[in-house]
Structures are given as C-alpha cells and as structure tokens.
C-alpha cells in the first residue's frame, strides 16, 4: 500500500538498482524523525478472526495433484541470484535500503532492520546523498508473474516469520514495473511489528500516473496467533475477478471490492520482500522506541492453473 507521489519513478527504477550500499558514518543518532508520517488510512477489519497454525507448511504435491503447476521456487538454499537488491532511501521511511541487510543464513532469507548511522542515496535512483539512522533490506524478483488468459489463476506463496518491534512493517507484495499504479500493485501481506496478531491486504490500480482508482481495497485480518512467533504460510491467489488471501492453507479473505481487480488481469508482477522502518503505518513516529528486527523468509513459490 505504498501510495505516494514519487513512487512511480521508484518502482520503475528499483529493480535495476543494485549498488554499493550506504556509507557508514560516526555521527550519533540524533533522535529526530519525520513528524509528518501518516498513520493507517480508514480501514475495514474482517469480522472473523483467522485461525493460524504455528510452523505450518504447504504441500506442493497436494497443489500439483489439484491441477497447479509450480513455476517458481526459491527455498534460499543457495544464493540470491533470483532477486535484485534495492539501495537508497524511500519517502516517508527512515532507513537506507542496503543489499547487505538481506542475507541467506542456514537456508533462510533474513531481512534485517538495524539502528546505525549511514549516508546513502536520498531515494532509490537519486544520486543525492542523505543521512539515515537505520538500514534495512528490500528484494525484488527478477522474474515476473501474471494472471492472464493462458494462466488465469496464479498463487504466490511465501513462508514467513514476520519481524516484531515498533516502527517495523513486514511486506510481501507484488507490483508491475512502470509508472505506478498503471501496472498494478498487490499487497499480499503487511504486518506492523507492534501489532503482529493482524495483517493487512490491499491492491492498487489506475490508468493515470500517481492516481489510485481502487476504492476501499485495504482489509485488516485479525488472527489467533502472534505472526512473529513462528513461521506461517501466506498465499495470494490472483484471478480475473478476485484476490483470495490464504493463511496457513485456509481462506481468510476473498477480495472482490475496490472496482479495479479486473484491470490487474494481464499485468505482469514482480515479487517484493521488504522491511521498512517507519512509513505509512506509523503516525507521529517515536524514533527512540525503534530497536530494529528481522523478517525471516523460508521460501517463496509461485503456482499457476488453468
């Protein structure tokens, strides 16, 4: 749900930016932040609390037996060659994204937000430098995925233990490369680190640059378990008429509202994993309360079906 003015340029360039990272400096964290960070927008909360299963895992065999074909599978046992790493800041967020903050450790992708003073690009694709008090990681898949006439159903799946901690938001989402939101964006999972028994889903689309025509697309889904305590499997099933969100194999939300889901059909998406510090979910952010944290990703898989 990253809907702000310069985002179209950032999304168009982010997947190409794999730079040398931000330069550390010795200046102490000064405790100041961005006082204009907006809080969550008006929201719809699912009246049903979803049942979550700690350390749940998906069965590839069960899916293939039901007509699904696996087209992408990264279990993070090797390197990050399937992904591009973003470098730089992002509007309304506090961190400098660095490739070094996304690492594979013992077969798990770890995206870590750290409190440290650095200088780096003010924003993605902007050579102007700025000072930051935090670093974090943002990866974007090199491969694209699309629900279209050939593959009308797409399931994008990730097994994640979200980050815990004030000021952090674990994101698992997709976007279409190009001027936002003309190629669409699908927010599979958004979890605030200080509210880890709830996750949000959303989507964006509009034919005009920087104009999201989706009305009321965001939904907050309460769950029975702390999503940061263990791994959970998040699935977004994308069809021409709906965005169906599954948690640990169970349908949580069938999103048909917003008026624009049909316009996402045929627009190729890249998968994105990120852990921003601050941003749109935190109003009047108190920097002193941010301690950092890690988002753990066991795997990312994509399945298609006719």
Task: Indicate residue ranges for each PLM-predicted region.
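Bacterial N-terminal signal peptides that target proteins for export
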Residues: 1-10
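GH16 jelly-roll
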Residues: 24-25, 29-306
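C-terminal motif of bacterial Sec signal peptides marking the signal peptidase cleavage site
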Residues: 18-21
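Intrinsically disordered, low-complexity serine/threonine-rich segments
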Residues: 11-12, 24
């Amino acid at each position: 749900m990253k809907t702000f003015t310069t985002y179209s340029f950032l999304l168009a360039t982010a997947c190409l930016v794999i730079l040398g990272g931000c330069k550390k400096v010795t200046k102490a964290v000064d405790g100041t932040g961005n006082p204009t960070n907006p809080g969550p927008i008006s929201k719809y909360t699912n009246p049903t609390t979803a049942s979550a299963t700690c350390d749940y895992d998906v069965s590839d065999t069960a899916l293939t037996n039901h007509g699904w074909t696996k087209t992408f599978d990264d279990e993070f046992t090797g390197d990050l060659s399937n992904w591009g790493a973003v470098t730089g800041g992002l509007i309304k967020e506090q961190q400098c994204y660095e490739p070094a903050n996304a690492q594979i450790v013992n077969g798990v992708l770890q995206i870590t937000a750290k409190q440290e003073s650095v200088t780096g690009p003010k924003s993605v694709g902007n050579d102007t430098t700025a000072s930051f008090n935090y670093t974090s990681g943002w990866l974007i898949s090199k491969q694209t995925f699309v629900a279209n006439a050939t593959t009308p159903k797409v399931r994008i799946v990730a097994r994640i233990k979200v980050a815990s901690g004030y000021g952090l938001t674990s994101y698992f989402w997709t976007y279409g490369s190009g001027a936002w939101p003309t190629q669409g964006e699908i927010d599979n999972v958004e979890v605030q680190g200080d509210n880890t028994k709830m996750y949000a889903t959303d989507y964006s689309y509009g034919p005009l640059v920087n104009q999201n025509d989706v009305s009321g697309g965001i939904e907050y889904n309460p769950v029975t378990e702390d999503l940061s305590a263990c791994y959970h499997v998040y699935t977004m099933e994308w069809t021409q008429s709906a965005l169906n969100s599954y948690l640990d194999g169970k349908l949580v939300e069938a999103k048909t509202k917003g008026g624009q889901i049909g316009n996402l059909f045929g627009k190729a998406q890249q998968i994105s994993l990120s852990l921003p510090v601050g941003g749109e979910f935190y109003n009047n952010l108190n920097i002193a309360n941010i301690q950092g944290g890690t988002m753990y990703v066991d795997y990312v898989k994509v399945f298609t079906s006719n």
